[in-house]
Amino acid sequence: MERQRSEEANRRFKDLNPSSLYDNLSKPDLGGSSELHTYMNDTSLADIPLFEDTLASEVSSSLISNPSKNNIQHLHPNTSEPFKTSSKSDEYDSYPRTGNVPTFSFTELNDTSVSGFGSQAVFENSVSPLSNPSNSPQAFDLTQGSSSTHNANDFTVNNVGSRRQSIYEFNIGIPSSNIDSSQFLPVSRAIAASEISPSSSPQLLTSFLPSGSVSNPSSPYLQGSVGALYEADAFNFVDVMSQASGTEVDSERFPSVDFEDPSLLMENQQNITGTGSFADYLQPPSSGSLGAFTNASPGESNTGIDFDTDNTNLNPSVDLLSNHSTPSFIFENSPSAEFSHQSSPYLVPNSGRTLNSENARESTIRSVNSPFSEDHADASLTTHVFDPISPTALSNSVLNYDSNNFSGTPQINVVPSSPSKSQSGPSLPANPLLQTDISITYSQSASPVSGQPAMNENSYDLQNANLCAPEMSPTYTARHRSNSAGSRFDAYEPIPQLYTHFSHSSECLSVNQDTELLGKIENDNSKSNDYLSVRNTRPRSRSLNSLVGNKSENSSSSKAKSESKSQGNYVCTFAGCNKRFTRAYNLKSHMNTHTNYRPFQCSICKKSFARQHDKRRHEQLHTGIKAFACVTCNQRFARMDALNRHYKSEVGQNCLRTATERGIQVPPSRKTAVASTSKQK
């Protein structure tokens, strides 16, 4: 008889609309529905699963079974606030209940927003039977293993029919001490769940399994075992590993988010306790808090990823590309140290060694086995990385080196250089100040030079005329430069001015088609005749070598050499400026003043200068040190040019005369001023 009454009550309750149940309970006399009265009289409330979206909390059976109590405004005995249909479970305290009816929580859409993902439905503040103090006298902690105070009867309910499974979660096994469920990503049904089985299909003996399928809950982060409810000690555990595999689902929901970012992955695991690397969380423990979960076979869980349990130690990822990064350029005008193995970890030995097991150890990084392809499950990445510094240069344990294999690694000095530009013919650029195609070397000639064409000082006909270079000082050495990217003028070497008054024994200049100044002048102090020859690195169809001069005019050559040195071989070719310089560096610095190119900047006030020594003198003004003093009046100056201006003034002239009369030694740089003062007398 009791069984028949229970079946009849189940049939009636199955056809009852939950919203009408709430409407009837809200009436003071509870008389709105005779069907509800009949059901309530025949069935104990303890046999009815209660849902928070219907009653907002569990209602004591004494309040419902006694229709004379009209205190429906305060159904909950522990609060004075009337319940609301959208209330959360944490708004009410726990109280004694009867029976083994589990409590279910419903998370409304847009209940809570997750930072970075907008407003989405999230699983939060869920209630499980284990949180009831009457049923759980002992706190349930997954870290201590399955509690012995619970059995399978705690999770059985009367078969009362379908229960809107798509909006309920049966969260019986959330490990409150390990994971805060409010930090999960937005809840959504697994993509495969809607395709495998409809959400309205009841499964197994109870309809309170996760959404639609026993193996596909509505949250991709609550993955449970198929047979979880059949075993007394195997609860519906939270799958920690699914937080890593869940990115496959999230990548389709959030295509604009890079889920491969390690910082984003770790953000979703901030509440996982424990130490170790991220790979440690990808290894299912053999025992402990998740022991029951790991007992399930791979086919019984939705972890989304397989693991090679035989290889529990995964080497951390290594950024191998950074070991082959391009080193920073050292610009010409910047004071920098030698670019050597002490200052760069990127040098690779180039002494002809081959990559083999004798002189280099292979650095193997084992890849994680892919669950999608068995053919590549054992694939691994093998790289050869060389470090010429020392075995401790890269401290990662994956990379091992032998320092003896890299002794004598050459030091490299890097200077930026733009790609070479070939020319159709031997011609100068539009700006004659830029030297592009000159390569100079010295070699001895046994044949005499003869002939010297007359040349205009401002004309350059390289195809039809022989170019004769000026007499070079024995101490002159060509400066090696390379073209820098951009419109930097300091990367080019100005062409020495060409003259027509050279002797027949002067050196003759020849030009090739190279784009960089590659030549080096090797001076020979012997009295034999020298000439300049072209050393071209590319095939050439014509030779521009020419021999001019006459051996009989050696005396006039020496005279012209001394005159050229006194006058200056390097002349500024800007209109209206015919200044001469004895050094190419001085001419280049002077050209910067015309182009307004000031590469040297004060480190304090950021003022720019065309010459480096001007910048250094300027920086002394900031220090307040006045290192230059007059030998007579002891007036001090921060710069030498200021002291020289003092000596040229009327007061300074008197100081120099006084110093001469007193026999005070004047610095060598001041002798010229003293001599000029004496001549004026």
From Swiss-Prot:
Keyword Zinc belongs to the record: yes
Keywords: Cytoplasm, DNA-binding, Metal-binding, Nucleus, Phosphoprotein, Repeat, Transcription, Transcription regulation, Zinc, Zinc-finger
One Gene Ontology term of the molecular function aspect: zinc ion binding
Zn finger (C2H2-type) start-end: 570-594, 600-622, 628-650
Keyword Zinc: yes
Record field: compositional bias (Low complexity): 416-428, 550-559
Source taxon at top rank: Eukaryota
Localization per record: Nucleus; Cytoplasm
Compositionally biased region (Polar residues): 66-86, 340-358, 528-549
Pfam families linked: zf-C2H2 (PF00096)
Residue ranges with Basic and acidic residues bias: 1-15
GO cellular component: cytoplasm; cytosol; nucleus
Modification note: Phosphorylated. Dephosphorylated by calcineurin which leads to rapid translocation from the cytoplasm to the nucleus.
Annotated stretches, region: Disordered: 1-29, 66-96, 340-372, 410-433, 520-563, 662-681
Any one of the GO BP annotations: cellular response to calcium ion
Residues modified to Phosphoserine: 543, 546
Function statement: Involved in the regulation of calcium ion homeostasis. Binds to the calcineurin-dependent response element. Transcriptionally regulates pmc1.
Family to which the UniProt record says this protein belongs: Belongs to the EGR C2H2-type zinc-finger protein family.
Protein name: Transcriptional regulator prz1
UniProt source species: Schizosaccharomyces pombe (strain 972 / ATCC 24843) (Fission yeast)
Taxonomic path: Eukaryota, Fungi, Dikarya, Ascomycota, Taphrinomycotina
